[in-house]
């Protein structure tokens, strides 16, 4: 199986203000990377999301940069791809920032392909599910227009529905 195409798409949508305790988030944002293969199998990865305050149109040029390094490679060689694209290019692009986020999306897309090729979910490839996990919910913060009733409802929902 070989990579034939790497696509980059940017999505943005309006949503009600969501407060994280530090500031209100703006619109929803997502950068999606799709990796396609010569066998018709494809994988998707993404970055951006709730805290993506930077303009997402800066992500596609990084995908363009990595595309020529990916086409023709075996997408199931996730470790080799991570080493070649991340570790070998760290001197050019640096150890963090946009390139790291794009590499994460590419890596997730390749893991998605690997899982599909082996008939397993990505979580199974990474060791399976746990019967219990610790959780954390932030909330109960003041926001303009939020009274005690709304605060109580938020906390009630978090305890009853989220745990």
Locations of regions flagged by a protein language model:
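Structured beta-strand/loop patches that form or line metal/cofactor-binding pockets in enzymes
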Residues: 1-51
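Catalytic cores of transferase enzymes with a strong primary signal for eukaryotic protein kinases
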Residues: 16, 96, 139
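Short glycine-/small-residue-rich flexible loop motifs, especially phosphate/cofactor-binding loops
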Residues: 32, 112, 155
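Metal- or metallocofactor-binding catalytic centers and their adjacent structured scaffolds
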Residues: 36-117
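Beta-hairpin (beta-strand-turn-beta-strand) motif
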Residues: 111, 127, 138-140
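Flexible hinge/switch segments at interdomain interfaces of large molecular machines
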Residues: 125-132
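Metal-dependent enolase-superfamily TIM-barrel catalytic cores that perform enediolate-based chemistry
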Residues: 132-163
């Amino acid at each position: 199986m070989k990579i034939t195409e790497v696509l980059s798409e940017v999505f943005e949508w309006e949503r009600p203000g969501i407060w994280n305790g530090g500031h209100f988030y703006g619109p929803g944002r997502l950068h999606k990377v799709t990796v396609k293969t010569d066998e018709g199998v494809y994988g998707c990865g993404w970055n951006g999301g709730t805290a993506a305050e930077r303009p997402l149109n800066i992500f596609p040029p990084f995908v363009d940069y990595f595309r020529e390094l990916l086409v023709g490679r075996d997408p199931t060689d996730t470790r080799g791809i991570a080493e070649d694209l991340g570790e070998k290019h760290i001197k050019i692009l640096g150890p963090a920032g946009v390139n790291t986020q794009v590499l994460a999306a590419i890596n997730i897309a390749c893991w998605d392909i690997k899982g599909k090729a082996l008939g397993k979910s990505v979580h199974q490839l990474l060791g399976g599910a746990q019967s219990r996990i610790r959780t954390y919910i932030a909330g109960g913060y003041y926001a303009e227009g939020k009274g005690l009733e709304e605060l109580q409802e938020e906390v009630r929902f978090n305890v009853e529905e989220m745990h």
